[in-house]
Curated annotation (Swiss-Prot):
Organism, as annotated: Geobacter metallireducens (strain ATCC 53774 / DSM 7210 / GS-15)
EC number, as in UniProt: 7.1.1.-
Family from the record: Belongs to the complex I subunit 4L family.
Enzyme class (EC, first level): translocase
Protein's cellular compartments: Cell inner membrane
Protein known as: NADH-quinone oxidoreductase subunit K 2
Transmembrane segments annotated in the record for this chain: 4-24, 29-49, 60-80
Listed PANTHER family: NADH DEHYDROGENASE SUBUNIT 4L-RELATED, NADH-UBIQUINONE OXIDOREDUCTASE SUBUNIT ND4L
Function: NDH-1 shuttles electrons from NADH, via FMN and iron-sulfur (Fe-S) centers, to quinones in the respiratory chain. The immediate electron acceptor for the enzyme in this species is believed to be ubiquinone. Couples the redox reaction to proton translocation (for every two electrons transferred, four hydrogen ions are translocated across the cytoplasmic membrane), and thus conserves the redox energy in a proton gradient.
Cellular-component GO terms for this entry: NADH dehydrogenase complex; plasma membrane
Keyword entries, A-Z: Cell inner membrane, Cell membrane, Membrane, NAD, Quinone, Translocase, Transmembrane, Transmembrane helix, Transport, Ubiquinone
Length: 100
């Protein structure tokens, strides 16, 4: 059986990879994928702690996080499609040049 410590280390590694991806990458789609990876690493932590403590609160909270992540992905991708139609690029530097 895999220990809690292993799950927490895996979650920290996934979160770190996601954070580095958000900070380094310029492509908005890749940034969204890295944010989703970070959310999934938090979900892994919730599930591992929920199983370790014998409490279902962490598992219930994961459903809410997954719902918010799905909504965030839908809105983010819709914005990226609209931006691509407008500028024909999804580079983050081009988004900074946009004015309201």
């Amino acid at each position: 059986m895999v220990s809690l410590h292993s799950y927490l280390i895996l979650s920290a590694i996934l979160f770190s990879i996601g954070t580095i991806g958000v900070l380094i990458r310029r492509n908005a789609i890749v940034i969204f994928m890295c944010v989703e990876m970070m959310l999934n690493s938090v979900n892994l932590t919730f599930i591992a702690l929920s199983k370790h403590l014998g409490n279902v609160d962490g598992q219930i909270f994961v459903f809410f996080v997954m719902t918010v992540a799905a909504a965030e992905a839908a809105v983010g991708l819709a914005l990226m499609i609209a931006f691509y139609k407008n500028r024909e690029s999804i580079d983050v530097e081009d988004i900074k040049l946009m004015r309201l």
